[in-house]
Amino acid sequence: MEGQSLRADLHLHSRWSDGSLPIPALLELAKRLGLGCVAITDHDTLAGQPQAAAAAQDLGIHLIVGLEISAFDPDTGRKVHILGYGIRDARRVEDTLAPYRQDR
């Protein structure tokens, strides 16, 4: 791969959180923009990842499983976001984050 470049966006949101596009349309846009690798990092959910995996495969885009976790810094009183990538146990993550989604 020497001398080659890969265009990527590793912080995308779909309608599963605060994005404006459904996953298929989001990935079609990524393809039109020349992106070869994306991570859909919806807030506090991996629910769209199976659909994303299928659409990415159909479009020839490399998908990194990701999400954006909403958190609170008690020292500063600020809401913060933590990006996570390469998640393998989606069910466990979904179960852990379910109460936080309900509190929004």
Task: Name what the model sees in each region.
Residues M1-G77:
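An N-terminally biased module of ancient metal coordination in phosphate/nucleic-acid-related enzymes
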Residues D73-P99:
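Active-site gating loops and adjacent loop-to-helix segments of metal-dependent hydrolytic enzymes
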Residues Q102-R104:
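Conserved phosphoryl-transfer catalytic core
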